[in-house]
């Protein structure tokens, strides 16, 4: 699996190539093997690198909703299980993949601690990490507290050849049980000074970090005009940091959160300013559901009973209600929407 996993210096190299060639990697939240396999299949078909990520809630779902998650055990074991699945099946696909965990607030840090404990043992046995990266999201705290904690985790991740994602400014909307719909709009826009502070503190430890800087991003999907994205904030931050630290233009690796429903112009402009990763969840949830919905509507008369359909009262319907059939329909519509995301991100045949 090691050759298929993008991690450490290889991840940094991929990010640099992405900025040079003006493309970004889609980061897909998954909640089971159906979505994992659909991501791997799409990335393989398109010959393009991809990021598969687990949220705290998505990981819990993989382990099983009946498992007590008070101590984060379900989220820990679910994320580990999902990551192992990627390692185990990826040789069947051409895709190269970054395995990541999504937003982790302070109250959920024991989740990451549990993954790191397991990950340390995995790294000692294998010589490479189980996960490529983790995200720590303390954007609702004072920046000093945010970065001080992130520095401690960056040290731990660096020892495992992993990357840290941090967040500056808050992504609006609601996702995975976190509701920021009523947040002060000023917090939706990161300032260059904040990016500069984070960069100066983290670069002293390692270059293996990426920054989710807020530029009006909102989780979920909204009608056009209801969300005001300002990608120029990223440009201003790049220029500020470049001048202050005398480093090349676009040195910061930025992350675009809340990618669902975003316009192509905003996406491409953000890529111009150093975005190398864009999170997509809501659109793909709906896309998967579309396939299942349409199949059930189309085959309704074959799904009303186990035996008996328009072709005859004694004809069995097993081939219609077998979950593998309608789950595959969901995978196919999921893949179609994901392909569009790859196209929007200018990430087609980028492994050549």
Cite the ranges covered by each PLM segment.
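Short, conserved beta-strand segments within well-ordered enzyme catalytic domains
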Residues: 27-29, 51-53, 98-100
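N-terminal amphipathic alpha-helix/helix-capping segment at the start of soluble metabolic enzymes
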Residues: 1-26
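Alpha/beta enzyme core
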Residues: 9-17, 33-94, 105-250, 264-269, ...
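Glycine-rich beta-to-alpha transition loops that act as phosphate-gripper elements at the mouths
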Residues: 30, 99, 103-105, 252-262
């Amino acid at each position: 699996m090691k050759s298929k996993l993008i991690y450490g210096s290889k991840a940094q190299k991929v990010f640099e190539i992405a900025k040079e060639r003006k493309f970004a990697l889609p980061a897909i939240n998954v909640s089971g093997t159906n979505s994992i396999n659909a991501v791997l299949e799409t990335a393989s078909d398109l010959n393009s690198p991809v990021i598969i990520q687990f949220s705290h809630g998505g990981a819990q779902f993989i382990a099983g909703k009946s498992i007590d998650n008070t101590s984060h055990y379900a989220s820990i074991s679910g994320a580990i299980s999902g990551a192992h699945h990627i390692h185990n099946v990826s040789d069947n696909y051409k895709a190269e993949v970054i395995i990541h965990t999504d937003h982790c607030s302070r109250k959920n840090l024991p989740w990451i601690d549990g993954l790191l404990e397991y990950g340390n043992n995995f790294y000692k046995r294998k010589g490479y990490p189980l996960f490529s990266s983790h995200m720590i999201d303390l954007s609702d705290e004072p920046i000093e507290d945010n970065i001080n904690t992130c520095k401690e985790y960056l040290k731990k991740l660096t020892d495992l050849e992993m990357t840290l994602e941090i967040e500056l400014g808050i992504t609006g909307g609601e996702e995975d049980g976190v509701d920021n719909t009523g947040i002060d709009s000023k917090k939706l826009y990161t300032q260059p000074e904040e990016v500069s502070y984070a960069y100066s503190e983290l670069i002293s430890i390692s270059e293996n970090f990426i920054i989710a800087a807020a530029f009006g991003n909102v989780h979920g999907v909204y009608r056009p005009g209801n969300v005001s994205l300002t990608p120029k904030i990223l440009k201003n931050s790049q220029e500020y940091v470049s001048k202050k630290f005398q480093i090349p233009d676009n040195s910061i690796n930025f992350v675009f959160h809340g990618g669902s429903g975003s316009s192509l112009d905003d996406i491409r402009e953000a890529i111009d300013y150093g975005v190398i990763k864009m999170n997509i969840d809501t659109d793909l949830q709906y896309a998967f559901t579309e396939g299942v919905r349409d199949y059930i509507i189309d085959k309704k008369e074959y799904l009303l009973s186990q035996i008996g359909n328009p072709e005859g009262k004694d004809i069995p319907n097993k081939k219609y209600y077998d979950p593998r059939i309608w789950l595959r329909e969901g995978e196919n519509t999921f893949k179609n929407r994901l392909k569009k995301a790859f196209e929007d991100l200018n990430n087609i045949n980028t492994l050549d």
